[in-house]
Amino acid sequence: MEGHVKRPMNAFMVWSRGERHKLAQQNPSMQNTEISKQLGCRWKSLTEAEKRPFFQEAQRLKTLHREKYPNYKYQPHRRAKVSQRSGILQPRVASTKLYNLLQWDRNPHAITYRQDWSRAAHLYSKNQQSFYLQPVDIPTGHPQQQQQQFHNHHQQKQQFHDHHQQKQQFHDHHQQQQQFHDHQQQQQQFHDHQQQKQQFHDHQQQQQQFHDHHHQQQQQQFHDHHHHQQQQQQFHDHHQQKQQFHDHHQQQQQQQFHDHPQQQQQFHDHPQQKQQFHDHHHHQQQKQQFHDHHQQKQQFHDHHQQQQQFHDHQQQQQQQQFHDQQLTYLLTADITGEHTPYQEHLSKALWLAVS
């Protein structure tokens, strides 16, 4: 039809466009009805991940169609007007073909192409224009001829009634297919909306992750910079301390040199003073070693005392446990009334230990 703008294909049409051709090549004798049924079942068995590329392609085609036809509005094909002349009659062959077209799968998950419906409508219109009923004359002549004419007229009326019913079924089925197609488009729009929401949510998460990562990097850089500044400050302070110590040492040396020139002269003139200084230093080292040795001995003595105390404490605990066990044994014997010489001896020993 010239000037008619086709609706954009949905996801199922995009997928079945190639699958229908493959299935028809693999099974040349398969009817279009059976092909449509199998395509519908296969599409229903696909997962969301497998359907996603076809939904995306359908969305792309829909966007291109909207850009190409911005003022497009869906207008279903108008049903061809049926002539009210009593002479129109569809032949049995055409009626059978149209009936086969009308018996397409009514499963809501199976979709047939609008081209098939266009062919059916064209066939129906062509048959209407090609066949006519003969006008019925008033019965005259022989009674058998009148009865035959009446019978033919009754058959023509029955055929016209059947044709009208087929027409109504075709119209109802076309409306059902259109409603299902609209439902598919609504599902497609809902799926696209869900995808857009998911993409927006993912974009928000990516922005949040980028913001968190950037914030962490800034914090790490600030921490590193602060640590570097602290190290520089410590190095500077240490350098200042070294410089102060060096200056103080030089001042002390200069002061000592200035205050005791005679001592320096005597130290230089008398090597014995050097020997005395060396002996004094050696004596100080020996004293320090003796002090350290004494501390080690004291620590060893303290450790020995601690071990002795621990050993005495363990012995006391063992004796106390043994005493408690013997006392329990005696109490049990008193309760049960059993007495042995060993129990009497043990009782006397415990009495002496307690007293």
UniProtKB/Swiss-Prot annotation:
Residues 159-204, 235-250, 257-278, 289-314 have a biased composition (Basic and acidic residues). One of its GO terms (cellular component) is nuclear speck. Residues 5-73 bind DNA. Its main location: nucleus. Residues 135-322 are annotated as: Disordered. One of its GO terms (molecular function) is calmodulin binding. Pfam families: HMG_box (PF00505). Acetylation of Lys-81 contributes to its nuclear localization and enhances its interaction with KPNB1. Deacetylated by HDAC3. One of its GO terms (biological process) is cell differentiation. SUPFAM superfamilies: HMG-box. PROSITE patterns: HMG_BOX_2. The keyword Iron does not apply. Keywords: Acetylation, Activator, Calmodulin-binding, Cytoplasm, Differentiation, DNA-binding, Nucleus, Repeat, Sexual differentiation, Transcription, Transcription regulation. It comes from the Eukaryota. SMART domains: HMG. The keyword Ion transport does not apply. It is found in: Nucleus speckle; Cytoplasm; Nucleus. The Gln- and His-rich domain may mediate protein-protein interactions. PANTHER family: SEX-DETERMINING REGION Y PROTEIN, SOX TRANSCRIPTION FACTOR. Belongs to the SRY family. Transcriptional regulator that controls a genetic switch in male development. It is necessary and sufficient for initiating male sex determination by directing the development of supporting cell precursors (pre-Sertoli cells) as Sertoli rather than granulosa cells. Involved in different aspects of gene regulation including promoter activation or repression. Binds to the DNA consensus sequence 5'-[AT]AACAA[AT]-3'. SRY HMG box recognizes DNA by partial intercalation in the minor groove and promotes DNA bending. Also involved in pre-mRNA splicing. Interacts with CALM, EP300, HDAC3, KPNB1, ZNF208 isoform KRAB-O, PARP1, SLC9A3R2 and WT1. The interaction with EP300 modulates its DNA-binding activity. The interaction with KPNB1 is sensitive to dissociation by Ran in the GTP-bound form. Interaction with PARP1 impaired its DNA-binding activity. This is Sex-determining region Y protein. It comes from Mus spretus (Western Mediterranean mouse). The lineage of its organism: Eukaryota, Metazoa, Chordata, Craniata, Vertebrata. The gene is Sry.
